[in-house]
């Protein structure tokens, strides 16, 4: 569009890699006449690039080899995108909530890069479930009430509405929020919504799943006592002592543990590792209900990656599994406290 009038206009040019004019940049006495109309020597470019590539003074900065690589890289991208099948469309969901003093850095472009080449976005914008410009802090009780209601309402208005009315039924989820809210998002998605959940890695800093081959040994420990008061400690991102749980629930609590040999915050690297963790979560839900009964109280103490928290909520079956209460660690509150 014209920047002044916003009217539609054609701003494209055909540029030559090897100039057809003897006075042009990168002119080659042998190649230029042969390749004057050859597609391998032509580039479709904008006005700015056309002027740049045709500037004789910039010829050393833009030799033929560089332009050929730029042309090939772009053509490879176009070939990749046009080869994607229609059933590979996906709705991008972005959900962020304030964590302590930090807001959630979620960007549509970063999400798109993580999708390709397996899926590509349905629209040029995402389904946003975040509460914008929230002044509440996660140490405030009001924070949890407001964030939970906002998440449920926006999920119903946008995600549930899309599932009921759109032909595309796949979702790609990018979320950064306190773990109780991530688990809640997972319970809303459940397995009713076909979805891929993405993890923000620290090193390298990317949403792309990595091709890690290392298998994770998920360790499950059952409680020494059989109690109707049950805690599930998920110590994957960090270690969590039993005392931090019994100080909240009491010494008569049966504590189940899901952990790994060396908990740390960047262990989850691949889809396969997340798939195995889902299976572990599902088995533990079944075992807790079987060993403690349907009338047991279940309390969740999570320390896990964001994708794991969402998947934990997804595998929970509201009609079959025990209802649970989720706790969050906060120094301002003196440790774990009840949230949702």
Where are these predicted regions, by residue range?
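Redox- and metal-dependent alpha/beta enzyme cores, enriched for Fe-S-associated oxidoreductases
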Residues: 213-283
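C-terminal functional regions that serve as terminal interaction/effector modules
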Residues: 287-340
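Histidine-centered nuclease catalytic patch
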Residues: 2-43, 53-64, 68-70
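Charge-rich interaction segments
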Residues: 77-158
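Hydrophobic, ordered structural segments
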Residues: 166-206, 309
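Gly/Ser/Thr-rich loops at beta-strand to alpha-helix junctions
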Residues: 50, 172-183, 235-241, 299-310
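A short, acidic, amphipathic alpha-helical segment used as a generic capping/interface helix at domain edges
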Residues: 151-163, 273-294, 308
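Long, charge-dense
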Residues: 191-220, 263-270, 323-340
């Amino acid at each position: 569009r014209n920047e002044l009038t916003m009217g539609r206009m054609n701003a494209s040019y055909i540029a030559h890699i090897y100039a057809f004019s003897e006075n042009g940049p990168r002119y080659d006495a042998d190649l230029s006449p042969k390749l004057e109309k050859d597609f391998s020597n032509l580039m479709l470019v904008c006005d700015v690039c056309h002027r740049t590539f045709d500037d004789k003074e910039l010829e050393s900065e833009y030799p033929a080899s560089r332009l050929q690589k730029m042309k090939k890289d772009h053509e490879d991208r176009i070939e990749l995108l046009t080869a994607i099948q229609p059933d590979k469309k996906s709705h991008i969901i972005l959900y962020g909530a304030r964590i302590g003093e930090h807001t959630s850095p979620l960007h549509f472009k970063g999400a798109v890069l993580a999708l390709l080449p397996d899926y590509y976005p349905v629209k040029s914008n995402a389904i946003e479930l975040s509460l914008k410009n929230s002044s509440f802090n996660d140490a405030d009780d009001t924070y949890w009430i407001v964030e939970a209601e906002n998440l449920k309402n926006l999920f119903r208005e946008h995600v549930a509405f899309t599932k009921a009315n759109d032909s595309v039924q796949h979702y790609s989820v990018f979320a950064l929020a306190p773990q109780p809210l991530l688990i809640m998002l997972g319970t809303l998605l459940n397995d009713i919504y076909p979805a891929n959940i993405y993890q923000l890695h620290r090193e390298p800093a990317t949403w792309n799943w990595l091709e890690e081959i290392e298998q994770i040994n998920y360790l499950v420990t059952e409680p020494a006592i059989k109690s109707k008061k049950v805690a599930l400690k998920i110590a994957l991102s960090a270690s969590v002592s039993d005392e931090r749980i019994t100080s909240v629930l009491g010494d008569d609590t049966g504590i189940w543990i899901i952990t790994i040999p060396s908990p740390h915050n960047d262990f989850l690297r691949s889809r396969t590792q997340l798939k195995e963790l889902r299976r572990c979560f599902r088995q533990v839900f079944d075992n807790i209900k079987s060993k403690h009964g349907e009338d047991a109280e279940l309390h969740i103490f999570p320390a896990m990656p964001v994708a794991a928290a969402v998947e934990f909520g997804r595998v929970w079956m509201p009609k079959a599994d025990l209802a649970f209460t989720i706790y969050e660690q906060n120094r301002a509150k003196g440790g774990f406290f009840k949230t949702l």
